[in-house]
Amino acid sequence: MIMNSAVSLVILLSLLCEAHTVVLLNPTDSSLPANNFTDTEAALSTPLESADIPKARRKRYISQNDMIAILDYHNQVRGKVFPPAANMEYMVWDENLAKSAEAWAATCIWDHGPSYLLRFLGQNLSVRTGRYRSILQLVKPWYDEVKDYAFPYPQDCNPRCPMRCFGPMCTHYTQMVWATSNRIGCAIHTCQNMNVWGSVWRRAVYLVCNYAPKGNWIGEAPYKVGVPCSSCPPSYGGACTDNLCFPGVTTNYLYWFK
């Protein structure tokens, strides 16, 4: 089956399983946090060849405008959560995460990966056929899951496979607003032919966003409720902007383009 390229569709994956009738088993153990910064950096530095992933040949993995749009949208969403968050950290762009996202997007595999990184990273995926005006058309469906989410735990919108693989999904949203997931890197790749659950999509636009430290730990809330910035980590020095613990201009996304 080959989809008409004029038809615009967005399909999403989460690290737990897919919403509605199409599901995906969780490829990671989300009950054992492995979000140590050093461990994450070590995993990201592992040669991509060892995971049978083609090396990215482009210097940039996403356009500057798309990168800024994705990053700003995440921070807007994070700063406006309800109930308000006391420890929500400002999200910054991470070049290593972007490189790892590009390496995976280049495989055109409609699944999470590579497996050796999923212990350390959160990951949201989106694929689309047809033209689109803004990259946010591939990102906003993740946020739209908020309508099915009730703080603090994604109860009814968190299907558990294989016993209960149906119902709405909200773990894309909770990854977006996981307080300690303060770094993101994304990549876009156009796949000439991409197998999406048995259907071949021509010129599929594949978006991969990687997050660190990863979120969606079972039994944990995405953030602490309270007065915004009242429980920021000491490393932020009390800096706060738009309800987010702010690290300062030297670490924002502009660093990537110096």
From Swiss-Prot:
N-glycosylated. It comes from the Eukaryota. Keywords: Developmental protein, Glycoprotein, Protease inhibitor, Secreted, Signal. It is found in: Secreted. Residues 71-211 form the SCP domain. Weakly expressed. Expressed at low level in prostate, mammary gland, salivary gland and thyroid gland. InterPro entries: Allrgn_V5/Tpx1_CS, CAP_dom, CAP_sf, CRISP-related, PI15_CAP. Residues 22-60 form a propeptide. Its main location: secreted. Belongs to the CRISP family. This is Peptidase inhibitor 15. The lineage of its organism: Eukaryota, Metazoa, Chordata, Craniata, Vertebrata. The gene is Pi15.
